[in-house]
Amino acid sequence: MVITRASGESLPQAAALACELWPGHAPDELLAEWETFTPGEGAVFLAMEGGAPAGFAQCQLRRDYVEGTDSSPVGYLEGIYVREAFRGRGLARALLQACEGWARERGCAQFASDCELDNAGSIAFHLGAGFAEANRIVCFTKQLREEA
């Protein structure tokens, strides 16, 4: 297993993995988003196993309020994914540790994340990795003007 910070030629590999986690997005869309990171404000890590892209993690600094925290900035795990064929080998934990180390290097005292309420696997991963549940919410939106 090799964990590296994705850049240059490895960013498209990470974007392809991210699209497996977030199927509503296209790789080019994610690459464009990642390229807008303010230097030092976000990072993408790539896990390689036997020369094959196996997983990725995206983390960022959040300076706004983060549920359950009392410091700023907070390192935030925006997404983490390991392909099914590579699960159970410690890749997700290694990716998380890379993100946590990145956040520590930027002065963060706390690290946070979120997941869908019905994602039992993600909840178990987070709890097993030392996260404590901070809150459960349901989010709502309402259109204020008619769409054209």
Feature names for model-found ranges:
Residues M1-A14:
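A short beta-loop-alpha structural element at the N-terminal edge
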Residues A15-E29:
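Helix-loop element at the rim of GNAT/NAT acetyltransferase active sites that forms part
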Residues E35-L46, Y76:
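A short helix-loop-beta-strand connector motif used in the catalytic cores of GNAT acetyltransferases and
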Residues L46, A52-L61, Y76, Y81:
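Conserved beta-strand in the GNAT
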Residues D70-E84, V138:
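Conserved acetyl-CoA binding element of GNAT-fold acetyltransferases
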Residues V82, G88-G101, A124, G128:
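Conserved acetyl-CoA-binding loop-helix of GNAT-fold acetyltransferases
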Residues R93, E105, L117-R136:
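Conserved active-site alpha-helix within GNAT-family acetyltransferase domains
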Residues L96, A103-D114:
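Conserved GNAT acetyl-CoA-binding A-motif
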